[in-house]
Amino acid sequence: MQTLNYLVIILIIAGVISVLAFTPLVRKLKIRFYLIQVLAIVLFVYVFFGRQIIYLFPDVYGQNSQSSQNLDSLRLSRIFLLDLCPFFAVIAPVFVFLKQKKISGVLAVFGLFGALVTLFGELIFTPVNEQDIVNFIFVGTGNNQIYFMMHFLSLLVSLAIILWDNCFSLISFFYIHVFALIYFSYVALMVSVFKGQITGNTTGILASDWTNGEYKNVATFLNLSNSDPQLVFIVGFSLSYVAILLMTLFANIPTFMEMKKDKIFIKKENLIRKDLELLA
């Protein structure tokens, strides 16, 4: 790992600490929902105009000059949001503005997990030199437009939603399964519709995903053979499932605390009622 990679790690940790540090203050403010919405707008605008629009209007941005199967596959993945992190960055900000907060909470769990895996499973290990550090952080390189900043902002927005908003309850455990079923079914359907045209960037649906990028590094970390993508797929998805459940459990801690307070309150009420009955 190079010296500049540690700078990237410091930036990530500083962002996380900032969200955590402001959490007690923000939760006391009536405008906390607006603060989340501002962060969500920044994420959406950055990703849409810095990344999505290039694939929606490739002729305007000169992206059709060198057409290839890999590039065509990437376009389809980008346009239809078949990768979880771009999906979160574009779709989650929309749900932040809805009165029903449960959906944004569920998306935040997946967004947080995806951002952490990519940031710490791939990006902090990407070789960076002094000439490219600014582009790496703010612009991206090659076809990985704003790759770091998209995941960094997704990390901050996800944390803000989870910590600042009261959008979780016990039913969230049910909702994360519903979302996973719908989203992965959607990705599998699009892969089937564009059979042979989409070769990767499908949130792990295709085996090629598990031999590249953060998946490859995670497989190396878990000491799994990249020559056996099925094993990487099974272990990776299993660990991902457990991690998402634990994140949902963590997000529900305030709910559990409220339930405990309610039980104590009800118990006190019952004791008072019994005392009054004895006095009567």
From Swiss-Prot:
Q: Which domain of life is it from?
A: Bacteria
Compartments it resides in: Cell membrane
Question: Which is a Pfam family this sequence falls into?
Answer: DUF5378
Q: How does the record classify its membrane topology?
A: Multi-pass membrane protein
Kindly list the cysteine pairs connected by disulfide bridges.
none
For this record, the Gene Ontology CC terms, alphabetical, are: plasma membrane
Keyword set, alphabetical order = Cell membrane, Membrane, Transmembrane, Transmembrane helix
Cleavable signal peptide: none
Kindly list the residue ranges recorded as spanning the membrane: 6-26, 38-58, 79-99, 105-125, 144-164, 171-191, 231-251
The identity of this protein, by name, is Uncharacterized protein MG135
Q: Which organism is it from?
A: Mycoplasma genitalium (strain ATCC 33530 / DSM 19775 / NCTC 10195 / G37)
